[in-house]
């Protein structure tokens, strides 16, 4: 299968260069409730970072704060060293952050190809067509359905379309919220295989919130654990997979997330 290649930014060495995305001591409120409590993290170029946590931990709120859907009360968010917090979402998209929210949001009455072109609304160049072909290369079923209204696609196909539309912005960072939600195990493996290929072949930097901790950690390079709006643990994916706490609470026998099904009896106190 021939897949065209998007123009890649130069590689950066972790620890020697500024991260693409920096979140510094962010606090975000839902009404009077503090949903994000002093969160700080980094995403380096060409890496996949995953965020793990139970329901209500603040993962989705964090992505919404980064993408401008919600405004932080405190802290900074930097993209390539420039502050973006508090900006309108369309401005943040133009700066290079694409957000694929949970729930497979597509424009149901537009065709597949029209949905992809909507993803390129911030662009005014002649390479939109070649980028659509790139998306079709990774998601061949979308090429077959390109003239079909998106509302008639299956759940897995809609998820592929949502990811493809996010790619059409040529993002510096692609935010993915629960891409496996509601999908069969076979489709989950297929989509995460494509996510890894997009990272390796196209150099797409990603921040991934995912309920399936096993597949997320085996796809990502680095991970953070959130609890009640705070970052309580961080490390390479290999380190997190080896953690007894992660194994006990998140990784079941079949690799399914155990969040919310039992109480987290930690062997140690988070630092």
Regions found by a protein language model. Give the residues of each.
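Glycine-rich phosphate-binding loops of nucleotide-dependent enzymes
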Residues: 2-271
């Amino acid at each position: 299968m021939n897949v065209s290649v998007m123009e890649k930014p130069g590689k950066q060495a972790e620890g020697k260069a500024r991260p693409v995305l920096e979140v510094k001591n962010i606090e975000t409120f839902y009404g009077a409730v503090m949903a994000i409590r002093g969160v700080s993290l980094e995403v380096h170029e060409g890496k996949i970072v995953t965020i793990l946590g139970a329901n209500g931990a603040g993962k989705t709120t964090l992505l919404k704060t980064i993408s401008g859907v919600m405004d932080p009360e405190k802290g900074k968010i930097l993209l390539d060293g420039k502050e973006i917090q508090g900006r309108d979402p369309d401005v943040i998209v133009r700066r290079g952050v694409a957000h694929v929210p949970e729930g497979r949001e597509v424009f149901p009455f537009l065709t597949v190809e029209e949905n992809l072109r909507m993803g390129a609304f911030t662009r005014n160049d002649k390479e939109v067509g070649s980028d659509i072909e790139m998306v079709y290369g990774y998601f061949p079923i979308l090429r077959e359905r390109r003239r079909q209204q998106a509302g008639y696609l299956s759940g897995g196909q809609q998820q592929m379309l949502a990811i493809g539309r996010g790619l059409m912005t040529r993002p510096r960072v692609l935010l993915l919220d629960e891409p496996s939600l509601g999908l069969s195990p076979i489709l989950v493996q297929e989509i995460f295989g494509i996510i890894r290929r997009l990272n390796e072949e196209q150099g797409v930097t990603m921040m991934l919130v995912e309920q399936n901790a096993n597949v997320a950690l085996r796809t990502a390079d680095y991970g953070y654990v959130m609890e009640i709006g705070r970052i309580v643990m961080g490390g390479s994916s290999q380190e997190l997979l080896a953690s007894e706490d992660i194994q006990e609470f998140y990784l079941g026998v079949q690799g399914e997330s155990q969040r919310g099904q039992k109480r987290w009896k930690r062997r140690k106190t988070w630092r």
